[in-house]
């Protein structure tokens, strides 16, 4: 087992030792996702390619670790329990995942058109298929929860500040849109990896794995992939904001070397692949965002993820 995680700029192939999904690309879909998450209306292709590489690398590493957990408990497939186990230390992101699983169950009820008779029949038969994701999560967390804090998340109505900020940003984006732009924006917001399930599975090269993820585990992986994109956009927007020198700011000269190169070096501008005045997120924004995030939860941080290996930390979980 290779214990060295990929660096932010590594390719998925080099990090995993497998040429996974290299003929399949989500770059086009990612451009739409990035737009809906706060990027410019026409996100840069080269930025989307870099984001795709980061997401792919992280998911391959996550799959490898989930497979190891599954193997330790003698299972033949990767299940939601394996992913929940890996996420158990990060309460905020685990809470977000549990809410997602609740919403998936709720949507399933609507799609299947469950009526009162169906619900009564399920109750009488002892079946709980209508809430299968919630039940999986609740049963598993109950089995490992020593303090009650994990189960308390099911009753937690705390506002998710990250989600709130994303919604407010989306609202600000739509203020200046005409009807055609708004329709395009709404369409972009509907995109997800879960709606491209077959392509997503091929992208991760699941068919070549000895221990494969089951259907619900794939749903969670698709969710985590989207959350990784969202967090990359969140962080890159902060980096871009910091790169704008503020008039009258006495500390504007004390920016990092990365920013100095961005402003003053033609080589740095060329490395971004676009003109510096573009309002789109650029590759250098993504790289700086990853550098900051990895440093923030580095080896000396008390909040280091339990499943983080020596290298880039997982963004979504």
From Swiss-Prot:
It comes from the Eukaryota. GO terms for biological process: positive regulation of DNA-templated transcription; regulation of DNA repair; regulation of DNA-templated transcription; regulation of RNA splicing; regulation of transcription by RNA polymerase II; transcription by RNA polymerase II. It is found in: Nucleus. GO terms for molecular function: protein heterodimerization activity; transcription coactivator activity. Residues 1-20 are annotated as: Disordered. The modification N-acetylmethionine is found at residue 1. InterPro entries: Histone-fold, TFIID_TAF13. Its main location: nucleus. Expressed in all tissues tested including pancreas, kidney, skeletal muscle, liver, lung, placenta, brain and heart. Keywords: Acetylation, Activator, Isopeptide bond, Nucleus, Transcription, Transcription regulation, Ubl conjugation. One of its GO terms (cellular component) is nucleus. Component of the PCAF complex, at least composed of TADA2L/ADA2, SUPT3H, TADA3L/ADA3, TAF5L/PAF65-beta, TAF6L/PAF65-alpha, TAF10/TAFII30, TAF12/TAFII20, TAF9/TAFII31 and TRRAP. Associates with TAFII31 and GCN5L2. Component of the TFTC-HAT complex, at least composed of TAF5L, TAF6L, TADA3L, SUPT3H/SPT3, TAF2/TAFII150, TAF4/TAFII135, TAF5/TAFII100, GCN5L2/GCN5, TAF10 and TRRAP. Component of the STAGA transcription coactivator-HAT complex, at least composed of SUPT3H, GCN5L2, TAF5L, TAF6L, SUPT7L, TADA3L, TAD1L, TAF10, TAF12, TRRAP and TAF9. Belongs to the SPT3 family. Probable transcriptional activator. This is Transcription initiation protein SPT3 homolog.
């Amino acid at each position: 087992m290779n214990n060295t995680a990929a660096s932010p700029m590594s390719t998925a192939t080099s990090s995993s030792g497998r040429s996974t999904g290299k003929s399949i690309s989500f770059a086009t879909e990612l451009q739409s996702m990035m737009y809906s998450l706060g990027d410019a209306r026409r996100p840069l292709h080269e930025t989307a390619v870099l984001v795709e590489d980061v997401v792919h690398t992280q998911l391959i590493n996550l799959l490898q670790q989930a497979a190891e957990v599954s193997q330790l408990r003698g299972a033949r497939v990767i299940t939601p329990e394996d992913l929940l186990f890996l996420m158990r230390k990060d309460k905020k992101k685990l809470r977000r995942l549990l809410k997602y699983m609740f919403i998936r169950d709720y949507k399933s009820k609507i799609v299947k058109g469950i009526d009162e008779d169906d619900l009564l029949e399920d109750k009488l038969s002892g079946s709980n298929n209508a809430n299968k994701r919630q039940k999986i999560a609740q049963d598993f967390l109950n089995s490992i929860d020593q303090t009650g804090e994990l189960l308390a998340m099911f009753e937690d109505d705390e506002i998710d500040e990250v989600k709130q900020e994303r919604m407010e940003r989306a609202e600000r984006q739509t203020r200046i849109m005409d009807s055609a732009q708004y329709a395009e924006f709404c369409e972009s917001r509907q995109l997800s990896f879960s709606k491209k399930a077959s392509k997503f599975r091929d992208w991760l090269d699941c068919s070549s794995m000895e221990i494969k993820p089951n259907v619900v585990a794939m749903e969670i992986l698709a969710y985590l992939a989207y959350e990784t994109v969202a967090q990359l956009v969140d962080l890159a927007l902060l980096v871009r904001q910091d790169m704008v020198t503020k008039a009258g700011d006495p500390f504007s000269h004390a920016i990092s070397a990365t920013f100095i190169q961005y402003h003053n070096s033609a080589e740095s501008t060329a490395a971004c692949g676009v003109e510096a005045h573009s309002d789109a997120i650029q590759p250098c924004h993504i790289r700086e965002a990853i550098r900051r995030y990895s440093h923030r939860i580095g080896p000396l941080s008390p909040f280091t993820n339990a499943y983080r290996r020596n290298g880039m930390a997982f963004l979504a979980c």
